[in-house]
C-alpha cells in the first residue's frame, strides 16, 4: 500500500476541519444556552474558575503532538471566543435590541411622531418660571412649521441646593395650560417614583434626567405608566449602560422610549460637556428606539448650536433639544445656554427644518 500523497493528506485535514467546526458549533449552542440560563439566574457570564477547572482536566488527557502548553493555548482561544458568543447572546436577548420594536411611524407624542423620519424639536425654557414667560415661548414655537414638543422643567434637580428648584405642581399646570392653548405636547422631567403620578397627570412625555438614568425603581415604574419616556444618558454612562436602563422600562411593558445623548464629562472645558456625536449612529445600529441630541446641555453655549445641530442630524438624530427663553439673561436657571426667540428661528432655518422668508 503506497503512502498517502500531499493531496490526500490535505483532503484529510479539510475533513477534520469541518468535523472540528461542527463540534465547535455544537459547543457554541451549549454555551449560548448556559449564557441564557445564567442571565435568568442573575449570574455573571464569565466564570474564570470554571475555565481553569476545564483546563486542568484537559491537561491530564493522553496527548500526542499536543502537549499541555498547546492544549492550553488552543482551549484558551476557544474560551475567549466562547465568551464573546455568550456576550452577544446576552445582548441580542435584550428587548431594546429587537428589530421592529418601534413602528415605522415612530413614537407618537401628541400630534408629533418622534422617529418617524422628520426631525423633531424639543424646545422651551430650562424651567417654567411664570405664565408670561412660558406663553411668549410657546406662542413663538407654535408659529414655526416644525414638529415641536414644548419642554420645561417644573421640578428642577440643581447641583446647588440654593438655586431655583422649580414651581413644582404649579409649573406643571402652567406648562399644560400653555401647551393646550397652542396645540403642543409637553415634555418635563420626573425626579422620583413619589412624584411620578403627579407629573404623568399633567404631561405628555416624561423625561428621565441624566442623574436618574441609574434610578432603577423609577425606570421600572415608568415601564408601567403607559406614557412616552425620554431617557437621557448620564454624563459618565456607556452606551451599553444607557441601553440597559432603557431595558428596565421596556421590559416592564413600555416600549415608547426615546434615547437622548446630552454630552459626557471629559477633561475638555471649552464646552459644558462633550457631545458624543458617535453615540447617535451607534445607538441607531444597536436599537430601533429613536435617538435625539440635547444640544444645550451638551454644549452649554449658544454660538456653536447650529454646526453641532447639523452634525447631529447628519449622524441620524431623530430630533434636537434646545433651551429657549424670551429673555435668557433674566432666566432663573441656565440662562447662559438658553437662546432667545429670534435666535431659535434662525437655528431651525439654518438646520433646514423651515425655510427663511423670501427664500425659494
Residue ranges and their predicted role:
Residues 146, 198-207, 223-229, 250-256, ...:
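Glycine-enriched alpha-helix->loop->beta-strand junction motifs that scaffold or abut catalytic
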Residues 156-158, 212-278:
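Conserved anion-binding
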Residues 44-58, 165-188, 222-228, 277-292, ...:
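Alpha-helix-loop-beta-strand connector modules within alpha/beta enzyme cores
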Residues 119-125, 148-152, 186-189, 206-208, ...:
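Hydrophobic faces of well-ordered beta-strands that scaffold small-molecule active sites
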Residues 1-98:
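Domain-level signature for soluble enzymes in the chorismate/prephenate branch of the shikimate pathway
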Residues 152, 156-203, 207, 215-218:
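N-terminal active-site wall of soluble small-molecule enzyme domains
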